[in-house]
Amino acid sequence: MADIQTERAYQKQPTIFQNKKRVLEGETGKEKLPRYYRSVGLGFKTPREAIDGTYIDKKCPFTGNVSIRGRILSGVVTKMKMQRTIVIRRDYLHYIRKYNRFEKRHKNMSVHLSPCFRDVQVGDTVTVGECRPLSKTVRFNVLKVTKAAGTKKQFQKF
């Protein structure tokens, strides 16, 4: 519990009561606090780290106060330089009627990445779900991570 207290405010899950009095039980050692977690539905499994972990994240869809509703999208991770937020790239085709052809286009999206998803790398494919606005630019939450396959055939810079 001491390793998660790195912020100025005391980090705790708001739905868990931590001041239980254990006078007559004769407790031995340090007991683990109960943990609040839930299923977001829509066929997405709750990660094991969300159930067993000790992180505190109020914007996590599995342990926080965020509901997933609206669109379900997918994209490729391009940047991981923010704290608990990643940038994903969504590629799509746009039809040009004059030339009867398609052109490639893309959009970048800022997405909240919960600490329950470890080992996320640039190039992984993520499935995101829409939620309420979490910040100025973040409106989606990561629900599932699919590891990038071995990219031997694609061109790599280095």
Curated annotation (Swiss-Prot):
GO terms for cellular component: cytosolic small ribosomal subunit. SUPFAM superfamilies: Nucleic acid-binding proteins (SSF50249). Keywords: Cytoplasm, Ribonucleoprotein, Ribosomal protein, RNA-binding, rRNA-binding. It is found in: Cytoplasm. The keyword Metal-binding does not apply. Coiled coil: none annotated. This is Small ribosomal subunit protein uS17.
